């Protein structure tokens, strides 16, 4: 099924790209973004719609946990709506920040009410009972994961390669713990096919349809498998990207000074002269090494 999903996406993406170009479903570049990105204006977007829908299909066939599929569907709707509004309005805004946050929070709450997870967490081998506070923690994990992947999706190929570099080791880690979440690999196969057309110069972008969904799935899987803290190490780059935004905003509001030339962090490296290809390569290797270190520490690989 993993290979089938890869081949299906590889076959369908050229068709989707032609269709989106014909329908002028293109990316609008935000004005506050780097000037270097001006040439990307009009590149087909919402490309995540394909690997998400095929992932959902093969996920159902592989009997993926219903809650994971539900989470995928809910976050897909948010990402799709955001991209759809951007295309219709012909600007980069889409949903407003508070609207997106509200929808993500509501989706996560629905998930938690249905999952009713145990209220303890595994803090790298130490079990901590959080009681009712766990629900707030889990809410932050799911919404935070969704936003972190969304923030990472700012360069050609970056979010896709980060997902692949983290999800495959994460799957092995869960397998070692007796949990099978094949949806991670199924989605990864679709993302790999997408990367054939998303690597610089990108012929299509995943849009929020893809990035918000990928992050939502990761957050949901971590809550279901009680691996919330481990998820951070398998996807360290999205965490760092998110922290760079928080630090940048906080520093400017409090001290009226910026820490980075621009946030998220990948834009900072762009503005100091790194090429997109170099940033994507360095970030991907960093994320992969972090993931492999986790596997080594916890005895998954000898």
UniProtKB/Swiss-Prot annotation:
It catalyses: UDP-N-acetyl-alpha-D-muramoyl-L-alanyl-gamma-D-glutamyl-meso-2,6-diaminopimeloyl-D-alanyl-D-alanine + di-trans,octa-cis-undecaprenyl phosphate = di-trans,octa-cis-undecaprenyl diphospho-N-acetyl-alpha-D-muramoyl-L-alanyl-D-glutamyl-meso-2,6-diaminopimeloyl-D-alanyl-D-alanine + UMP. The keyword Transferase applies. Its cofactor is Mg(2+). Its EC number is 2.7.8.13. GO terms for molecular function: metal ion binding; phospho-N-acetylmuramoyl-pentapeptide-transferase activity; UDP-N-acetylmuramoyl-L-alanyl-D-glutamyl-meso-2,6-diaminopimelyl-D-alanyl-D-alanine:undecaprenyl-phosphate transferase activity. It comes from the Bacteria. It is a multi-pass membrane protein. Keywords: Cell cycle, Cell division, Cell inner membrane, Cell membrane, Cell shape, Cell wall biogenesis/degradation, Magnesium, Membrane, Metal-binding, Peptidoglycan synthesis, Transferase, Transmembrane, Transmembrane helix. Its main location: membrane. GO terms for biological process: cell division; cell wall organization; peptidoglycan biosynthetic process; regulation of cell shape. Catalyzes the initial step of the lipid cycle reactions in the biosynthesis of the cell wall peptidoglycan: transfers peptidoglycan precursor phospho-MurNAc-pentapeptide from UDP-MurNAc-pentapeptide onto the lipid carrier undecaprenyl phosphate, yielding undecaprenyl-pyrophosphoryl-MurNAc-pentapeptide, known as lipid I. Pfam families: Glycos_transf_4 (PF00953), MraY_sig1 (PF10555). The chain crosses the membrane at residues 1-21, 42-62, 68-88, 123-143, 154-174, 178-198, 204-224, 229-249, 279-299. GO terms for cellular component: plasma membrane. Pathway: Cell wall biogenesis; peptidoglycan biosynthesis. This is Phospho-N-acetylmuramoyl-pentapeptide-transferase. InterPro entries: Glycosyl_transferase_4, PNAcMuramoyl-5peptid_Trfase, PNAcMuramoyl-5peptid_Trfase_CS. It is found in: Cell inner membrane. Belongs to the glycosyltransferase 4 family. MraY subfamily. The keyword Membrane applies.
């Amino acid at each position: 099924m993993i290979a089938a999903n890869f081949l299906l996406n590889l076959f369908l993406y050229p068709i989707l790209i032609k269709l989106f170009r014909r329908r002028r479903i293109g990316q609008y570049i935000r004005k506050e973004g780097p000037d270097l990105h001006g040439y990307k204006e009009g590149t087909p977007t919402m490309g995540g719609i394909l690997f998400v829908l095929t992932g959902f299909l093969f996920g159902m066939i592989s009997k993926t946990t219903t809650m994971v599929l539900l989470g995928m569907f809910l976050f897909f709707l948010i990402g799709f709506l955001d991209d759809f509004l951007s295309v219709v309005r012909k600007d980069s805004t889409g949903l407003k920040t508070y609207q997106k946050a509200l929808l993500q929070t509501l989706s996560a709450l629905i998930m938690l009410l249905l999952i009713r997870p145990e209220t303890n967490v595994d803090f790298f081998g130490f079990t901590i009972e959080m009681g009712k506070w766990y629900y707030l923690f889990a809410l932050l994990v799911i919404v935070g994961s969704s936003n972190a992947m969304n923030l990472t999706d700012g360069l050609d190929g970056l979010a896709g390669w980060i997902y692949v570099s983290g999800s495959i080791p994460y799957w092995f880690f869960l397998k070692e713990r007796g949990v099978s979440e094949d949806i991670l690999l199924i989605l990864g196969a679709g993302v790999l096919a997408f990367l054939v057309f998303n690597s610089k110069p990108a012929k299509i972008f995943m849009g929020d349809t893809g990035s918000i969904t990928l992050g939502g799935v990761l957050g949901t899987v971590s809550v279901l498998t009680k691996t919330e803290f481990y998820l951070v190490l398998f996807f360290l780059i999205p965490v760092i990207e998110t922290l760079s935004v928080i630090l940048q905003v906080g520093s400017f509001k409090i001290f009226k000074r910026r820490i980075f030339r621009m946030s998220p962090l990948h834009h900072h490296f762009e503005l100091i002269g790194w090429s997109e290809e170099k940033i994507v390569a360095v970030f991907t290797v960093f994320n992969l090494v972090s993931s492999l270190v986790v596997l080594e520490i916890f005895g998954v690989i000898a």
